[in-house]
Amino acid sequence: MLIIEDLRAFEVLDSRGNPTIKAEIMLSDGSMGSAIVPSGASTGKKEALELRDNDERFGGKGVLKAIENINGTIAENIIGLDAFNQTQLDNTLLELDGTKNYSNLGANATLGISMATARAAANALGIPLYRYLGGANASVLPVPMCNIINGGAHANNNVDFQEFMIMPFGFSSFKEGLRSVCEIYAILKKELAALGYSTALGDEGGFAPNLANNTEPLDLLMTCIKKAGYENKIKLALDVASSELYKDGKYYLEGKVFSNEDLIARYEELCAKYPIFSIEDGLAEDDYEGWIKLTQKLGNKIQLVGDDLFVTNEDILREGILKNMANAVLIKPNQIGTITQTMRTVRLAHRNNYRCIMSHRSGESEDAFIADFAVALNTGQIKTGALARGERTAKYNRLLEIELDNDEYLGDKL
């Protein structure tokens, strides 16, 4: 048994220049592990609490309170625990906090410790993180959902939908699929410039031009896919983030007002016209009636992903499964607070034939933990932004490294 011998946490910066937590764990054999916690912009109401200082520093976004919790209460209670018993560690963190959403210690504090301990344990054994967390069956490279046009809360433009993504299905390897996305991304930049559109980037590395409506990005993507020579090998995915468009039971976009039935009809039209594989957060997190209707209409045709709807929460997902809402769940560890709770949600989804998509947050870092985690849990899909900005490419580069020892790419088998 190796025990947690020491730990520390301190402020670092995320990709938006906001403070976040870096946690470091030291084990009794001298092994170490560290982790940097991400942060979201478009967040679900039921996410675990990200503890911020709310004072004059960094416009209130400092995390010194959470760091004090790590270096104080958490350290006092986990030093001496078995580093290889992740469940015991994470249960201890949950019990220490005393709430379901980590409103005392902060989910950013607990997740940092949870991630760093897993990494330290893997380092102690001299094995990759994905192998430590996933065992012998962790070997499948996920299909990336590459967000190459940004809108909504991730960009300062007039596009309502938050993410327009491409997914490389028709390839035999992850690296070839990634290459196709890189080539399409480069063509898109030239296409936007030729049309006189901005090629400025959004939070996740995608382009963020002002466009006529929410279908022009889809037309642009189809043009670029064709120019790159990858027709029939690439599918499209959307993150509508519709909770951001929802007010008083209605949806406000493109200068119009939509009921949930109107919006569902809009999605049906889009799916008939474009090769759309997936729609995320197609309806607001509180619009349960709408989600049931959407799943009845499109659930047998495309992937319907709940992000704000489920917030990586096992209990909320279980309720959604019983109500037949969505058929897939986005997996964001910082929505729930520990590695163990994240894994439980994935297992519940898989037992009920719900797909899983491992996901970054818009406020990210160079930490590539989720790349290993996606392979460990065989999620089959990963969202980690565009092929630009180092905090995004860090995850892709880690997956390329993992592929050197694992040559199975899900691709068309998804």
From Swiss-Prot:
<feature type="binding site">
    <location>
        <position position="332"/>
    </location>
    <ligand>
        <name>(2R)-2-phosphoglycerate</name>
    </ligand>
</feature>
<dbReference type="InterPro" id="IPR036849">
    <property type="entry name" value="Enolase-like_C_sf"/>
</dbReference>
<dbReference type="InterPro" id="IPR000941">
    <property type="entry name" value="Enolase"/>
</dbReference>
<feature type="binding site">
    <location>
        <position position="280"/>
    </location>
    <ligand>
        <name>Mg(2+)</name>
    </ligand>
</feature>
<feature type="active site" description="Proton acceptor">
    <location>
        <position position="332"/>
    </location>
</feature>
<keyword id="KW-0963">Cytoplasm</keyword>
<feature type="binding site">
    <location>
        <position position="239"/>
    </location>
    <ligand>
        <name>Mg(2+)</name>
    </ligand>
</feature>
<dbReference type="InterPro" id="IPR020809">
    <property type="entry name" value="Enolase_CS"/>
</dbReference>
<feature type="binding site">
    <location>
        <position position="383"/>
    </location>
    <ligand>
        <name>(2R)-2-phosphoglycerate</name>
    </ligand>
</feature>
<feature type="binding site">
    <location>
        <position position="162"/>
    </location>
    <ligand>
        <name>(2R)-2-phosphoglycerate</name>
    </ligand>
</feature>
<dbReference type="InterPro" id="IPR029017">
    <property type="entry name" value="Enolase-like_N"/>
</dbReference>
<protein>
    <recommendedName>
        <fullName>Enolase</fullName>
        <ecNumber>4.2.1.11</ecNumber>
    </recommendedName>
</protein>
<dbReference type="InterPro" id="IPR020811">
    <property type="entry name" value="Enolase_N"/>
</dbReference>
<feature type="binding site">
    <location>
        <position position="362"/>
    </location>
    <ligand>
        <name>(2R)-2-phosphoglycerate</name>
    </ligand>
</feature>
<comment type="pathway">
    <text>Carbohydrate degradation; glycolysis; pyruvate from D-glyceraldehyde 3-phosphate: step 4/5.</text>
</comment>
<comment type="similarity">
    <text>Belongs to the enolase family.</text>
</comment>
<keyword id="KW-0456">Lyase</keyword>
<keyword id="KW-0324">Glycolysis</keyword>
<keyword id="KW-0479">Metal-binding</keyword>
<dbReference type="GO" id="GO:0009986">
    <property type="term" value="C:cell surface"/>
</dbReference>
<dbReference type="Pfam" id="PF00113">
    <property type="entry name" value="Enolase_C"/>
</dbReference>
<keyword id="KW-0964">Secreted</keyword>
<dbReference type="GO" id="GO:0006096">
    <property type="term" value="P:glycolytic process"/>
</dbReference>
<feature type="binding site">
    <location>
        <position position="307"/>
    </location>
    <ligand>
        <name>Mg(2+)</name>
    </ligand>
</feature>
<dbReference type="GO" id="GO:0000015">
    <property type="term" value="C:phosphopyruvate hydratase complex"/>
</dbReference>
<feature type="binding site">
    <location>
        <position position="361"/>
    </location>
    <ligand>
        <name>(2R)-2-phosphoglycerate</name>
    </ligand>
</feature>
<dbReference type="GO" id="GO:0005576">
    <property type="term" value="C:extracellular region"/>
</dbReference>
<feature type="active site" description="Proton donor">
    <location>
        <position position="204"/>
    </location>
</feature>
<dbReference type="Pfam" id="PF03952">
    <property type="entry name" value="Enolase_N"/>
</dbReference>
<dbReference type="GO" id="GO:0004634">
    <property type="term" value="F:phosphopyruvate hydratase activity"/>
</dbReference>
<comment type="function">
    <text>Catalyzes the reversible conversion of 2-phosphoglycerate (2-PG) into phosphoenolpyruvate (PEP). It is essential for the degradation of carbohydrates via glycolysis.</text>
</comment>
<keyword id="KW-0460">Magnesium</keyword>
<dbReference type="GO" id="GO:0000287">
    <property type="term" value="F:magnesium ion binding"/>
</dbReference>
<dbReference type="InterPro" id="IPR020810">
    <property type="entry name" value="Enolase_C"/>
</dbReference>
